[in-house]
């Protein structure tokens, strides 16, 4: 039985939730998100709360209910507060700049890298070695951050590359003769 699914999701003031079968739409100040929930989950809306439960006769329904509750909670937090992800570039000559709807990266390749940002994601560069991604969709921000990091993941000897701000890169010792 899922402890996560048992807790209801509170709907704050200014957030509008629409249930249409298994599709849930959350609209708030920062934007609008929509998601289709698994058929094994029963969603009920009571005033300013959403409750999740399992459908009878489905094997992993409690697990799916917990997952659905976490996803919907992230949607509610996203449209009220939003999410941010910070990336740090470490290395000689590694730079980032915003170019329209893309992030321009200089990462030691023979060519500059342009990463196009999807709709709903905003990027800013407080300095040449920092990228801050903001948006209301937690999953999309994480995916964009992972895509940017994949251009130059931090290497374990000198730590050069693109890392998350909260990431701790374990370093290795150099080979000894």
Curated annotation (Swiss-Prot):
Single GO MF descriptor: rRNA binding
GO cellular component, one term: cytosolic large ribosomal subunit
The UniProt record lists the keyword Ribosomal protein: yes
GO BP annotations, alphabetical order: cytoplasmic translation
Keyword terms, alphabetized: Ribonucleoprotein, Ribosomal protein, RNA-binding, rRNA-binding
The keyword Ribonucleoprotein is annotated on this UniProt entry: yes
SUPFAM superfamilies associated with the record: Ribosomal protein L6
Classification via Pfam families: Ribosomal_L6
Assembly notes: Part of the 50S ribosomal subunit.
Function: This protein binds to the 23S rRNA, and is important in its secondary structure. It is located near the subunit interface in the base of the L7/L12 stalk, and near the tRNA binding site of the peptidyltransferase center.
UniProt similarity note: Belongs to the universal ribosomal protein uL6 family.
Name recorded for this polypeptide: Large ribosomal subunit protein uL6
Organism, as annotated: Vibrio vulnificus (strain YJ016)
Lineage summary: Bacteria, Pseudomonadati, Pseudomonadota, Gammaproteobacteria, Vibrionales
